[in-house]
Amino acid sequence: AEMLSKHKRVLCIVNTRRDAKELYARLPQEGITLHLSKMMCPAHISETLEKLKNALKDDTNEVIRVVSTQLIEAGVDIDFPIVYRQEAGLDSVLQAAGRCNREGKNGLSTTYVFSLSKEHNLPKGEMQAANNARLSLGTGIDWFAPNVMTSYFKQLYCRKECFDVK
């Protein structure tokens, strides 16, 4: 919450509804500070997204801080100068990065990937598989390149230990 409070316009995506609720509660309630998760009914989610989109269109310096679960990662056309994403699979991190400087108006912008305490992260098997797939691809590569995503998913899905086994 402290890091998010340093930014006037920021999006933070976390892995669970509980984390979204707790982080939102710790943010200063100034300007437009929003929580988005499936704890909300669909009508309230739509209303909140509409409020957010309208606020982002306004070029004032109003504070806009949003804490959301993954529901904002795909199919939501929003643009923030700074995005924070709790550690997750590469696909989720890249979806979150797609909400950062989406329109290219801000020059270089930053997406930060962070970890919370162990009890707030993805299930161990899921996180381990995602990390192994990421590490196997190496460093210094273009994570947005289609061939990199293909390689990532091949590595991820060949590791059956992260999936349910009957």
Mark where each language-model region is.
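C-terminal helicase lobe and adjacent C-terminal extensions/tails of nucleic-acid helicase motors
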Residues: 2-9, 13, 18-29, 33-49, ...
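Conserved two-lobed SF2 helicase motor
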Residues: 57-73, 85
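Conserved P-loop NTPase nucleotide-binding/switch module
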Residues: 75-77
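Short hinge/gating elements
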Residues: 79-83
